[in-house]
């Protein structure tokens, strides 16, 4: 059995909202919260070196179990000493269970209580993923935080189908914790369960009740930002978050735009991840304090200003919008490197500012002032 322990320390609670600062104590170092985690699908954040991530200041990144399980495979990563030895990223890794990719990428998948059978999107080979295998893989990766295998119910499905999904997820929850408790003694990564239940309050509470019996070190909220209207995201984020014990670090999966991050922090969320900041950067969409801009637009052809005059990242200190537009249009590799660096540095700096506002009991003012400028732009 793994020891019961708390990995989260509350540093400050905002005076007028659930927003809070804290610190996560993980095997590969501390993580100040709130914290955004860049997504490194194949143990690398696309177009970024580990030194880039370190230079910006990130203390934790995410890697995808599904992709790493299929290629290069668990044996290669274990032989390298886990993800840290394989990638030379010395700080923390959070890994997902692989379930979301199985359901979104794979063809001919079949879900049963035992697990999910699926075909690889790479070569069509038949594969099987269960709660126990997900824990075994992530333990082999030496993940600092690993996630429970779950079913993320699609937006818009019936309550009957959502309940059927939830029953399987709760079965997998029990099996995941049984497997985690049997991992080697020297492995000290945390297992985070995931609150599901779709857009039904009673099912969300049923999911959380099952989770709390396991006294987890942290809890994730899943099944949000999956295509629902923004007001529904806000409603169910707020509803779910307020029922989670305050001594647990709270992770909301799949959010990474400034407006969604602010809404999460406003509800007491501590960590969040999303592929969009880096993917959008590669596709020409860049964050600024005045809203996102599309660098491919002709209006930037003679614009010799930085991406964002308020941003202190090295890209904004050295390069202009006109130059970045040129790199994008000529499909230069350097474009993806510079654009990704900027978007991730922008979010990191924003979250630093959020932490400072919380410490000063002025989060609500920061929230309103940021969104007033950010949402006022249509590009």
UniProtKB/Swiss-Prot annotation:
GO CC term (a single one): cytosol
Keywords attached to this entry: Glycosyltransferase, Metal-binding, Queuosine biosynthesis, Transferase, tRNA processing, Zinc
Cofactor stoichiometry and binding remark: Binds 1 zinc ion per subunit.
GO terms (BP aspect): queuosine biosynthetic process; tRNA wobble guanine modification; tRNA-guanine transglycosylation
Keyword Cell membrane belongs to the record: no
Binding residues annotated for substrate, in chain numbering: 96-100, 150, 196, 223
Binding site for Zn(2+): 311, 313, 316, 342
Reaction catalysed by this enzyme: 7-aminomethyl-7-carbaguanine + guanosine(34) in tRNA = 7-aminomethyl-7-carbaguanosine(34) in tRNA + guanine
Cofactor(s) of this protein: Zn(2+)
Function: Catalyzes the base-exchange of a guanine (G) residue with the queuine precursor 7-aminomethyl-7-deazaguanine (PreQ1) at position 34 (anticodon wobble position) in tRNAs with GU(N) anticodons (tRNA-Asp, -Asn, -His and -Tyr). Catalysis occurs through a double-displacement mechanism. The nucleophile active site attacks the C1' of nucleotide 34 to detach the guanine base from the RNA, forming a covalent enzyme-RNA intermediate. The proton acceptor active site deprotonates the incoming PreQ1, allowing a nucleophilic attack on the C1' of the ribose to form the product.
Record HAMAP family: Q_tRNA_Tgt
Family label: Belongs to the queuine tRNA-ribosyltransferase family.
Full protein name: Queuine tRNA-ribosyltransferase
């Amino acid at each position: 059995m793994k020891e019961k322990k708390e990995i989260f320390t509350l540093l400050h609670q905002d005076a007028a909202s659930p927003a809070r600062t804290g610190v996560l104590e993980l095997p590969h170092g501390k993580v100040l919260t709130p914290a955004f985690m860049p997504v490194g699908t194949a143990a690398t954040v696309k177009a970024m070196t580990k030194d880039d991530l370190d230079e910006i200041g990130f203390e934790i990144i995410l890697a995808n179990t599904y992709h790493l399980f299929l290629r290069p495979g668990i044996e290669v990563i274990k032989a390298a000493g886990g993800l840290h030895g394989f990638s030379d990223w010395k700080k923390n890794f959070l890994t997902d269970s692989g379930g979301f990719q199985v359901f979104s990428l794979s063809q001919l998948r079949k879900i049963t209580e035992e697990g999910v059978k699926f075909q690889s999107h790479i070569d069509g080979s038949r594969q099987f993923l269960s709660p126990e295998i997900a824990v075994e893989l992530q333990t082999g990766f030496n993940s600092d935080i690993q996630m429970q295998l779950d079913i993320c119910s699609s937006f818009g499905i019936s309550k009957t189908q959502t309940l059927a999904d939830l029953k399987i997820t709760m079965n997998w929850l029990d099996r995941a914790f049984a497997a985690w408790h049997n991992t080697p003694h020297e492995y000290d990564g945390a297992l985070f369960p995931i609150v599901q239940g779709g857009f039904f309050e009673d099912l969300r509470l049923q999911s959380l009740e099952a989770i709390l019996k396991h006294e987890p070190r942290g809890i994730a909220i899943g099944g949000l930002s999956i295509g629902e209207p923004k007001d529904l995201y806000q409603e169910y984020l707020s509803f779910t978050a307020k029922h989670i014990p305050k001594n647990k670090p709270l992770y909301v999966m799949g959010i990474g735009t400034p407006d969604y991050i602010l809404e999460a922090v406003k509800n007491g969320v501590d960590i969040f991840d999303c592929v969009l900041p880096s993917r959008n950067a590669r596709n020409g969409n860049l964050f600024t304090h005045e809203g996102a801009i599309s660098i491919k637009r002709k209006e930037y052809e003679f614009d010799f200003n930085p991406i964002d005059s308020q941003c202190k990242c090295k890209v904004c200190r050295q390069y202009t919008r006109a130059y970045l537009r040129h790199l994008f249009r000529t499909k230069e590799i350097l474009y993806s490197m510079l654009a990704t660096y900027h978007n991730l540095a922008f979010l990191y700096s924003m979250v630093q500012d959020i932490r400072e506002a919380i410490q000063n009991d002025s989060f609500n003012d920061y929230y309103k002032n940021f969104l007033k400028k950010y949402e006022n732009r249509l590009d």
